[in-house]
Structure formats: C-alpha cells, structure tokens
Amino acid sequence: MSQPIIALSDINLAEARRQLKDIMPFKGDPETLHTFISRVDYVISLYQTNDVRQQRILLGAIERNLDGQITRSLGLPNVEDWPTLKARLIAEFKIQTPNYKLLENFRETPYRGSLRAFCEEAERRRQLLISKLHLEGNQSDFLIYIQGIKESIKILIRKLPIQLFTILAHHDITDLRSLITIAQNEGIYEEHINFEFYEKPEYRNKNSNSNQNSKTQKFNTNVQTQNRPSYSQYSQPFQPNFNQYIQPFRPSYTQQITNNPPMWHAPNYFRPNQYINPQPIIQKNHFQQYPNKAQFPQTTHFRGNTYPRLQQPSTYKNTNFPITKRLRPSDSEQTKMSIDEIRFQDAHEFEQVQPNYYEQQYFNQNQYNPYQNHSFINEGQQQVQFVQINNKQNQNNSELNENFRLTVPENTNT
C-alpha cells in the first residue's frame, strides 16, 4: 500500500525556500558543519513533503548555500533529496580528529588571564566534541563522552589560579554554564588574575646578527651554560678576559695533579701572579757571566747538544736578601763605596729582576776557539791544554769559595 502524497502549497513552498536562503552558507569549515546541518533539518521538519518535484526545489535552495568547490567534490547532480546530501556532507567534512583526542584537548584548556576567556575557549573545544558526536549519531558513545565532560569540569577548576579556585571550590559545578553563572554572581568573571611566578631573564645570543631587528632577534634558551668560563686543570694556558676588571675564576693548585714531569718554560716577568704560592718566588740567574772570557767553559752533553756548565755564584746563597754592600777585605781602610762598587751592586740587583740572557757568551766544545793559537798545536795538544784549563778553573773556584772575600779594585774613586 503506497503512502499518500503530502504536498506543500505554493505559499508554504515559497516560505520554505526563503528560510533556506537565509541560512549562513557552508564553505567547508568542519566546525560550522553541525550548525549548517541542524538549521537545514529544522526548516525541512517545518515544511515536510514527499512530492519529488517539491523535494528537488528545496534541494536546489540548499545547494545555493554551498560553496562551488563543495558541490563539485560531492557530485550533486546525482543527489535527489536532502538525506543523501546530508550523509555525503558528514562523511566528507566532519572533524577527523578522534573523539578521545577532542576530550583530552578539552581537559587541557589553558588559562589566559581572565575567567571569561578561559570559559569561552573551553566551550569552543566542548562544542567540537559534541557536534561530532551528534553528526555520527552513535548514542552509546554520546553518553560516555558526556559523562567524561562532566568529570573534566573539576579538573579545569583545579588548574585555575588559587584566588579563583578558593572561591569556586565551595560550589557544586557540573557544567560550564553553571561555572559561568557562579563566576558572574561572585564578581570574578571579568577580572584579570594571573599566576604568580617569576620569569627567567632572556640573554641575547652572541651569534645573532647585530643589524637584525630587536623584535625578531633570537634568544639563547640555554641560560645555564651561557657566558660561563670554560677551563680545565693545567690543560690549556690561562686565557684572560678582554675586560681587565672581570677575570674568569681559576683555582690555585699547590700540588701537581698529573704524574707527568713539569716542563720548564722561560719566565715571563711582566705577567701578574696567576697562582697563590705560599713560597717566595726566587729569581735565579741560570746564565752566569764568566770573569775570564779567554777561558773555554766546561760543557755538559744533553741529548746530543752542548750547553755551558753553570758556575757557582760568589755572592750570598740566600737570594731573599738582596746585596746591600760589596764585600771587602778586613784590612781595607775604605769607608765609602766607589763608583765601581755602586755599579756592581746595581748590576746584581737588576739581574735578580731581569737577567740579560743575550749577553751570555756561548762556546761549543767542538767550536773553534778564537783565544787560542792553533797554528802550532795539534788535536792531542789541544785536548791536554783544555784539561789543564779546566783544572785551573776548578782550583780557582775552590779557593774563592773558601776565602769568601773579594779583592778591592785598585782604581777606585775616594
């Protein structure tokens, strides 16, 4: 038995077309799909008809509210009624995010300064989940997620600042609508309340371009390692800062850390003290002046090279006490220091601070001796004479050490 034909009058059909024309057009946004479909369903429910001609007239009015790209993608020439078009719109333009992910996004709604902005953002995220559940039409899933939304309201309230939470915790809040109503009654819906926290200072990255705009410059997020002096224990030389008032900290070590033998370096007398040493720094003159340049100095072999053997100094052994007066014999009647003695004293005091290495005479054992006549001396006689000179030099040194007195110069100024 066929159903009776229900047809609309011309006035009702024109009214239905006018109301469908006033609906906001759908341009493919998934967030507005549920609103568009619900309004069309409302108009169709008011003007129901099973006449094929009138259904196509109403379908044409609905198609005028769709974007041209949507009509081409859906293939509307093959669609004859609204239920078929509705199913294709839902399958093509609904939100593709899973329902559990939408519920998680609702629970993670951020607080941005005011309770009103917080409630509006939470309501927008809730509507995305609710609209998708309505479009899918699964009643069991709808009930489960509605219960999850009610439980999420308590989680959102706990994330609010303490000033707002202490006021809202005394009320039984089950949905966002009741939260907004209670906040308006308490007078905190429009107030701007922020969290109390301290921001870390931002440091400008050294590698950033100086000509770049200050608003677009990047900042180094690794604040802990920025501008920290990097040094290791005796691995690299001391690198001072370009600012003389800001020097990087370097600890003082009184003992050598490694087992490797220390390497000798030429002393730098112009640098400041880098390490705190409890013992006094003694300036030793490693290169002594030979009183008689005609003597050939005794040498010591070291790794195939020859170096002059250092002679024992004829002054005080303890260099902590500088020379104040030149030694004289006990029978000397001189009471004033001569000019030679003053120069002798100044020379020794200067050598304690800055020894003159470049004035040192150096002779190799195998080098030609300019102070000796080689015209009538062969190699054997030269070796014998060299041994005699060394013995005589050692004898003079021993006598000088036993006497501890120096001979007064003959030509002195009184």
Swiss-Prot record:
Residues 221-235 have a biased composition (Polar residues). Keywords: Transposable element, Virion. Its main location: virion. It is found in: Virion. Residues 206-220 have a biased composition (Low complexity). Residues 204-235 are annotated as: Disordered. It comes from Drosophila melanogaster. The gene is gag. This is Retrovirus-related Gag polyprotein from transposon 297.
